[in-house]
Structure formats: structure tokens, C-alpha cells
């Protein structure tokens, strides 16, 4: 709530936002304390398997899953917005334009599964996937209103293929890193990263987009009320946007695209972090 409301509903330095951040931090500390000292439960029945943090390889693989999820969900969230704002697509058509990313993501997952099952080597797949994803993220960051659809498709294919190479791989790898009786908890550990990371990251990148676009528009067009700007950002088909001059509309769209591009800074960072971490992975085979 603090991230979503900050800068839009309430100023970042307002009491409401500060209070929300304080409450969130307190709840995290309370949860960690309860898990560390097993308050009201036993170490074996804790909701979060903290003992896995002592296993370096398992921790690395979990972080890599966080990165893979970020690399997948951010473009899936932002690309349809780009096509709806810039190309004036309907929601359905904007979703259709995601097919290049989704198809190559699925194909990459299948190919990765076949080859890793055959030879057991997983480190090269992490490295190659992260390199492709990082390149795709960097290229998507350069997209503007004049970028052709073909280029956007190509960039999304790069990030989809790269993410597909290692999106599901951690679930197989962790099973070779723990005893058989700990496999369910290890899979849960990775699943937490898979679901938790994009939940937080999407809130962050959406806040960055809305704040960047809102502030840029407000600074350049002081005559447009802040409430009207928020209405415009809710969809280019709004009456408020349609009433503006065409030159003003194009300038606002440029600010919106610049705001959307901020999200790819996070994916580039995720790709870079994952690329570095992959260099420290075991180069052997699973279950060797």
C-alpha cells in the first residue's frame, strides 16, 4: 500500500505513507522473529524454512528464481500498456501482441527441460538465459513511440527465451541439493521467491511508472490538474485525453513511454545480478 499510494494518493513524506512503511517493517520483523525462534510452532513446522539460507547453492538458486520471475512478469505487465497507449490497441489486441514473448518462453522451458534431463548440466542454461534476458531488457528500455512493432516483438522474444531457459530450472536443481525428505520444503522455498519477488517488484515498477509520468506531465503542462493526469494515465481512451490538442497528446504519450521504460531498469538489474550469480553455480551435473 505504501508503494502503491506514494506520490499519487499521498506525498512520499506524508504521515500516511511513513506510517504504512513503519507498520510493514514492524510486521516483517515480527514475522522473522517468530520464525527464527519458532514462537508458537516447532522448527520442523515453520512456515518459512530459514535453515536453507545456510546452504549457499540453495540460496543462490532461490535468488535466481526471483530474478527469472521479475524478468518474466515485468514485460508481461508493461508491454500491453505500451501497445494500448501508443498503438491505441484494445485490451485483447494488446494481449495478443504478447504472444511472441509467451510462445518463445514456453518453447525455451520445454527445450531446457529436455536437455537438462538428458545431461544434467544446468549452469550453462542459467548463464545463457540471463545473458539473453539482460540484452532483451536493455533493448526494451530503448523503445519509444517510433519503434516498430517488429523490433518490440524481437526484443520481447529475447527476454522471453532467456527467462524461459531458467524460469523452471531452479525447481529441478533444488531437488539435487537437499535430502529427499527436505524436497517439499525446498520447492516451497523456491516458490516463495517465484511468487514473492514479482509481487513486490511489480508494485515498485508500477509506482515508478506512475510517479515518473505524472511528475513529467505536471511539470510540462501546469494547466492540467493532477487529478486529470491520473485520469489520463488510466487509459488513453479517456475523455480528458481526447479533449487535448494532438501535439499535447503526443508529448504526454512520450512521457508515458519514458515512464514505462523505467520498469526495464529493474529487469536489467535483475538480469545483471542473475548473470553474476550464475558464475558461482556448481558446474557439475544434477544427481551426479
Model-predicted segments: where are they?
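C-terminal membrane-cytosol helix-exit motif in multi-pass small-molecule transporters
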Residues: 1-8, 23-40, 275-281
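Interfacial helix-cap and linker-helix signal at transmembrane-aqueous boundaries
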Residues: 3, 7, 83-84, 115-117, ...
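Transmembrane core module of solute transporters
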Residues: 13-26, 30-33, 37-185
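Membrane-embedded alpha-helical segments of multi-pass transporters/permeases
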Residues: 29-33, 106, 110, 138-141, ...
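Helix-loop junctions on the cytosolic side of multi-pass membrane transporters
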Residues: 33-42, 145, 211, 215, ...
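Hydrophobic alpha-helical elements at and bordering transmembrane segments
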Residues: 53, 63-66, 192, 252, ...
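Transmembrane-helix exit segments and adjacent C-terminal regions of multi-pass membrane proteins
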Residues: 237-288
Amino acid at each position: 500500500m505504501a508503494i502503491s499510494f506514494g506520490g499519487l494518493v499521498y506525498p512520499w513524506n506524508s504521515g500516511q505513507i511513513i506510517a504504512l512503511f513503519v507498520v510493514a517493517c514492524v510486521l516483517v520483523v515480527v514475522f522473522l522473529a517468530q520464525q527464527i525462534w519458532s514462537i508458537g510452532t516447532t522448527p520442523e513446522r515453520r512456515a518459512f524454512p530459514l535453515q536453507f539460507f545456510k546452504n549457499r547453492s540453495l540460496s543462490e538458486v532461490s535468488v535466481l528464481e526471483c530474478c527469472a520471475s521479475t524478468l518474466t512478469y515485468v514485460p508481461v505487465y508493461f508491454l500491453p500498456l505500451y501497445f494500448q497507449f501508443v498503438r491505441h490497441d484494445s485490451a485483447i489486441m494488446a494481449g495478443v501482441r504478447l504472444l511472441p514473448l509467451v510462445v518463445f518462453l514456453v518453447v525455451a522451458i520445454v527445450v531446457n527441460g529436455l536437455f537438462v534431463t538428458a545431461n544434467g548440466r544446468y549452469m550453462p542454461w542459467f548463464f545463457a538465459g540471463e545473458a539473453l534476458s539482460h540484452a532483451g531488457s536493455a533493448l526494451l528500455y530503448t523503445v519509444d513511440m517510433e519503434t516498430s512493432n517488429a523490433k518490440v516483438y524481437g526484443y520481447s522474444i529475447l527476454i522471453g527465451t532467456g527467462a524461459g531457459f531458467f524460469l523452471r530450472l531452479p525447481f529441478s536443481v533444488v531437488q539435487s541439493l537437499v535430502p529427499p525428505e527436505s524436497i517439499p520444503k525446498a520447492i516451497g522455498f523456491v516458490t516463495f521467491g517465484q511468487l514473492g519477488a514479482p509481487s513486490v517488484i511489480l508494485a515498485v515498477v508500477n509506482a515508478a511508472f506512475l510517479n515518473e509520468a505524472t511528475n513529467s506531465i505536471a511539470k510540462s503542462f501546469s494547466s492540467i490538474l493532477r487529478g486529470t493526469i491520473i485520469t489520463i494515465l488510466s487509459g488513453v481512451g479517456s475523455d480528458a485525453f481526447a479533449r487535448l490538442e494532438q501535439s499535447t497528446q503526443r508529448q504526454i504519450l512520450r512521457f508515458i513511454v519514458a515512464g514505462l521504460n523505467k520498469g526495464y531498469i529493474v529487469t536489467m538489474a535483475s538480469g545483471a545480478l542473475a548473470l553474476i550469480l550464475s558464475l558461482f553455480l556448481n558446474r557439475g551435473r544434477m544427481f551426479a
